[in-house]
């Protein structure tokens, strides 16, 4: 039986001399107590040495992934196939690949593991020609290379540098503010007008460092820092200043403070450039989405880029506003809509009405960019630029929607225009060019009004006729009551009908055409009454 043993120096193939002793697994370690005993159990048949660490790294990465290296394939074809013996391997997965590709029988068992442990303990005595110092150096180099490969370590992707840089930048800003405030107050006793004329802090300190006492402003040239107009104003103010006189020692201490301010300002500029470059190297997509400072503060708040990538979009949105969040939860009020992400340019340029909506969308896209930067192999910022363009388009739509609501053009723009085919021939309407008086719409309305007046007059005439007839009938009915002592039921009904007709108002729109005409029976009765009277 042959044994494949991998070392940091090369591949070793051993021949098992006494296979009977392999049956006793528990006592096999006793056979490898000394190099002499080990040489009685196994014997080196072939040793394939690596040329350098790169070759060793390629071989071991292939072994870890369960693949056969070209160099190993050559050794197995040359040595093992000719021997026609089974091959003992430490990895069962590797044995399956060797059996599949080279058609060699492989063995993997607890006995093989114990045999490998014994060979490893006496490796220096079993492999001649390899010095212990060389073996140790190769082991150390291969260990570093393997760990770097497995962790996919990159010197550029060290987010610890970002955490420290942004913290130092914040500290420098605080120190600069304190120093500049102290410098302005201190020198303000001597020349108070200078602080009102020069608003820039760095320019103020540079002018102060160059001139010192206000008496020297008349002869000093400040064209390096100030424009001609401001320089003339400073010189004029120095002549009529209301400040007190100070000693040379005071001026000296103020100048030392100005030197500190200038040096810290220059270092801050250098540190900001370093932070920009480091952010573009580690998280280019996050930098495009929210900027260098906001991205660095998010990473610093989470601790690292990997920790930040594990957060949800809703967490990233309110990251940095934990105090306000827990205060709102405790008092049962509305929770904050944004934290550190509020300082991003996309949220800053939005109107207050849409800040919450944009911060939510920006947090969702920023989380995608963070995960792409943390786990992706590509180092380009194309994905971040594409997502930022989408957010800007969405922001424009939201802003336009608000403008349309104010102007009232939203419904007009929402209506689809009528489709007109290009082949349609459009004719010119000449009616607009005519200067002759035409019938206006007002005249048509007047004609309609006249017709309405005519119909109303006819309706009134019909009403008057109906009323006259009803009155005549009422008089006739009264006369009949006088003549006849007992009126019949039919006459009462007729009277009721006549009263009902008198009470009902007739509509003006539909004039009543059916008039109450007396029946022929009534006419006969009237004639009889007249004859009786005669």
Swiss-Prot record:
Cross-link Glycyl lysine isopeptide (Lys-Gly) (interchain with G-Cter in SUMO), where in sequence: 467, 502
PROSITE patterns: NOP
Localization per Swiss-Prot or TrEMBL: Nucleus, Nucleolus; Nucleus, Nucleoplasm
Chain segments carrying region Disordered: 470-534
Keyword set includes Nucleus: yes
Bias (Acidic residues) ranges: 470-486
SUPFAM superfamilies: Nop domain (SSF89124)
Residues where Phosphoserine is found: 109, 304, 351, 507, 519
GO CC annotation: box C/D methylation guide snoRNP complex; Cajal body; cytosol; fibrillar center; nucleolus; pre-snoRNP complex; small-subunit processome; sno(s)RNA-containing ribonucleoprotein complex
Protein name in the entry: Nucleolar protein 58
One of the GO BP terms on file: ribosomal small subunit biogenesis
Database matches in InterPro entries: Nop56/Nop58 (IPR045056), NOP58/56_N (IPR012974), Nop_C (IPR042239), Nop_dom (IPR002687), Nop_dom_sf (IPR036070), NOSIC (IPR012976)
Species the sequence originates in: Rattus norvegicus (Rat)
Gene name for this UniProt entry: Nop58
Composition skew (Basic residues), residue ranges: 490-500, 522-534
Example of a GO MF term: TFIID-class transcription factor complex binding
Major location (coarse): nucleus
Signal peptide: none
Record-linked Pfam families: Nop (PF01798), NOP5NT (PF08156)
Modified residues (Phosphothreonine): 34
Family note: Belongs to the NOP5/NOP56 family.
Crosslink site: Glycyl lysine isopeptide (Lys-Gly) (interchain with G-Cter in SUMO2): 157, 353, 411, 415, 422, 426, 441, 444, 465, 467, 490, 502
Nop domain segment(s): 282-400
Protein modification: Sumoylation is essential for high-affinity binding to snoRNAs.
Assembly description: Core component of box C/D small nucleolar ribonucleoprotein (snoRNP) particles; the core proteins SNU13, NOP56, NOP58 and FBL or FBLL1 assemble stepwise onto the snoRNA. Interacts with NOLC1/Nopp140. Interacts with NOPCHAP1, NUFIP1, RUVBL1 and RUVBL2; NOPCHAP1 bridges the association of NOP58 with RUVBL1:RUVBL2 and NUFIP1. Interacts with PIH1D1. Part of the small subunit (SSU) processome, composed of more than 70 proteins and the RNA chaperone small nucleolar RNA (snoRNA) U3.
Functional summary from the UniProt entry: Required for the biogenesis of box C/D snoRNAs such as U3, U8 and U14 snoRNAs. Part of the small subunit (SSU) processome, first precursor of the small eukaryotic ribosomal subunit. During the assembly of the SSU processome in the nucleolus, many ribosome biogenesis factors, an RNA chaperone and ribosomal proteins associate with the nascent pre-rRNA and work in concert to generate RNA folding, modifications, rearrangements and cleavage as well as targeted degradation of pre-ribosomal RNA by the RNA exosome.
Keywords: Isopeptide bond, Nucleus, Phosphoprotein, Ribonucleoprotein, Ribosome biogenesis, Ubl conjugation
